[in-house]
Amino acid sequence: LYTARALSFDGVEYDVLEHALTPAQIEIYDAYAGAFRTIHHNLEAALTATGVNDASGETNASAARASAKSRFESTKQRFFNHLLMGMKAPTIIRAIEDDLAAGNACVIQVVSTGESLLKRRLETVDSDDELVEGALAPRDYVLGYLEQAFPIHAQKLVEIDGNMVAEPLRDEAGALVVSREALALRGAAMMELMTLAPIPSALDQILWA
């Protein structure tokens, strides 16, 4: 087994390897789609609870709203890409095994290794704990988004150069004020996500095979 961060080659031909989702995989996909519907709904509610949006749905802070929406959409796209790759892994592994049995060498090009996510997860592990084994699942990307980017901090309206804009609300000690409603919305989204079956990443499945 050899690994390389970059690989050059020519004369390569590509063919389609089709994977038919099983009924169980379709059910899991639909469940995650439902969880994202909850996250999207809770995100809109949290933007109102924190003061980014007003009661009518109009925004008081276009930059804050655009940032929250952008992070959500990029997380959603990355998640479903990794989820589908994880579901395709069994078919990929069988093709690799067939090629190896035929005496061929297999080159696997991995677009994302999840290295940055793994580093963040390791940073949360106590230095005294023994790390026996661990695995990353696509839903960890979503949990990371909810923990780090979901809007929970209250905003206040201030006038700057004649324009009303929103900025983070701070308490007397200078700490950011957390909206309890937004915090509850985030917790509900995380709880629903954690109840769903984790699908190991494609890379982990290939390494374990």
Regions found by a protein language model. Give the residues of each.
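ASCE P-loop NTPase motor core, strongest for the SF2 helicase catalytic module
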Residues: R78, L83-K119, S127-A209
